[in-house]
Amino acid sequence: MFKRAMSTDGPVARTILKRLECGFPDYKNFAFGLYNDSHKHKGHAGVQGNASAETHFRIEMVSKKFEGLKLPQRHRMVYSLLQDEMAQANGIHALQLSLKTPQEYESKAK
Amino acid sequence: MFLPKFNPIRSFSPILRAKTLLRYQNRMYLSTEIRRAIEDAIESAPVVLFMKGTPEFPKCGFSRATIGLLGNQGVDPAKFAAYNVLEDPELREGIKEFSEWPTIPQLYVNKEFIGGCDVITSMARSGELADLLEEAQALVPEEEEETKDR
């Protein structure tokens, strides 16, 4: 049997993309990644009894909206966009974020 | 600012509205007593980490990674305190509201909220974390034994 890659087209992932589009309309102009890492954490203490295959996500996003903001402020922007999904018992359990401005991304890429 | 003040989808869904209400109640749930207990914890050492599990036995990969980073930086154990949120549901929920940060671990240095695992990882990479901890005088002192001239 082939192992199925964790999909990023489940309902939670789709909601994430929708929310990001509202909050950061420019993110599609830049490099972007949404990763579902739930399989790496299957059944560990924090998600026992949570059968959802969409508990652990990783987002790599670039937006001009991050300009002039420190990292915790950038994280809070994304957290507050997704606060409903994170507050639910069966919702997002962990969210890894890499949030850069276009300039930061460019200078890293070179 | 970036979040529309009024989300029409929300107001049409009674389920979502109930959830919002519930969250609001959670927000009220942080009593002065718990707030004070959290403040005491934050003041208990220059470097304070709220984590899942203990430094010896972390119960979550992100808590483990953060402990590892602080150890690599050479944080002085005497200046460090860790609190296991899994032992106390009031702390676990309370700290999220207190810091306005929805995930664990959470790092405080000199009573100031620094961030979670991603923020700390990125600060470690850029050298900011070392600067911050040095400024807070939270690192193990360099070998001073041979220069006892004072």
Show which residues each predicted segment covers.
Chain B
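Short acidic loop-to-helix transition motifs that present clustered carboxylates
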Residues: 87-91
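Thiol/disulfide oxidoreductase modules built on the thioredoxin-like
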Residues: 97-102
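Local sequence-structure signature of Cys/Sec-based thiol-disulfide redox active-site neighborhoods
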Residues: 38-78
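Structural signal for hydrophobic/aromatic residues that build the beta-strand cores
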Residues: 49, 70, 80, 104-107, ...
